[in-house]
Amino acid sequence: MNIKRITTEADLHEALKIRRGVFIEEQHVSEADEFDEFDTLQEQCQHILVYHENQPVGTGRARIVGHTAKLERICILKPYRKYGLGKIIVSGLEEIMKEKGLTSYKLHGQTQAAGFYQKLGYQISSQEFMEDGIPHVLMTKEISRNIT
């Protein structure tokens, strides 16, 4: 398993295919809600891929919103879940945003995944709300700047 920062249109296409499989086909999110103006290689939105045996099987993105990093679109193809890939994706996105000087993180986590994010240090910061027809909660995390 390895992780890669997306820097090419071909890699971005792979990430979008994974998101289509998970969010649109599996969870029935509309295409209009899933894909947006941040699905590009622009600097303020970073995308990553996680690989299993040289095949892309998971993805996520993080973008800068004010002084906060917002982690989004974190997903893994169904056969590859429960192998620790989600933790790799979240850690990778956090590291990219930390390199940009951000220490405040937030995400809209599906309620059924809140326990996963809590194990990674996120706290539930809202009541449950609906997003794209799926129950979510706002989750936040603050990290320290390790100045060396």
Curated annotation (Swiss-Prot):
> InterPro entries of this UniProt entry?
Acyl_CoA_acyltransferase (IPR016181), GNAT_dom (IPR000182), GNPNAT1-like (IPR039143)
- Which GO terms fall under molecular function for this chain's record? N-acetyltransferase activity
The UniProt entry, under Gene3D superfamilies, shows: 3.40.630.30
Highest taxon above the source species: Bacteria
Domain N-acetyltransferase span(s) in chain numbering? 1-144
Pfam families xrefs = Acetyltransf_10
- Name the chain's protein: Uncharacterized protein YyaT
Protein's organism = Bacillus subtilis (strain 168)
Q: Which gene encodes it?
A: yyaT
